[in-house]
Amino acid sequence: MAGTNPRAARIAALIQRVIASSMEAQLHDKRLANVTITEVRVTNDLQIAKVYWTQLGHEGHEQGERRRAQQALNQAKGRLRSLVGTKAGLRLTPQLEFIFDEVPGEAHEIEDILALAHKRDEELAKSRANAQYAGDADPYKHDEPDDDDFDDDDDVEVEDWDDDDEA
């Protein structure tokens, strides 16, 4: 792809500019009104250009609008390729493949999830502000000697065990 070949990267940037400006100026298709070209990747042999696009759509109508925009891009593919060839001055103009870019939509979903997590963290911090620990201040049990079992005054007999007695 364009990352390994500097010439392919330059041509990809040129194709992106040409297609984006041509969609506004020369293609007067209402289906392409909210279409944005996000990235173009060109193979190292300059034969294929993958054009990634996204669409700012209305909630609920995105699938239908996306399908109509894809049809409009496919119908305009020949004209756009011709414009790219004219502006780029290449011997062979790359074949254009239009691919819907899922990344902006997924990024928006991730941002929503992170915002929800941040909101829950704030709520948890508020509930912890006035919280108190349950139970005693010192939750560990300590062994206290009972006075009834053993007194210091009691004499304790200790038997001596010799190894000779056992044999």
Swiss-Prot record:
Pfam family for this entry, one: RBFA
Stored InterPro entries: KH_dom-like_a/b (IPR015946), RbfA (IPR000238), RbfA_dom_sf (IPR023799), Ribosome-bd_factorA_CS (IPR020053)
Acidic residues: compositionally biased ranges: 145-167
Gene3D superfamilies: 3.30.300.20
UniProt region (Disordered), positions on chain: 127-167
Entry GO CC: cytosol
A biological process term (GO) from this entry: maturation of SSU-rRNA
Functional description taken from the UniProt entry: One of several proteins that assist in the late maturation steps of the functional core of the 30S ribosomal subunit. Associates with free 30S ribosomal subunits (but not with 30S subunits that are part of 70S ribosomes or polysomes). Required for efficient processing of 16S rRNA. May interact with the 5'-terminal helix region of 16S rRNA.
Similarity remark: Belongs to the RbfA family.
Protein name: Ribosome-binding factor A
Species of origin: Bifidobacterium adolescentis (strain ATCC 15703 / DSM 20083 / NCTC 11814 / E194a)
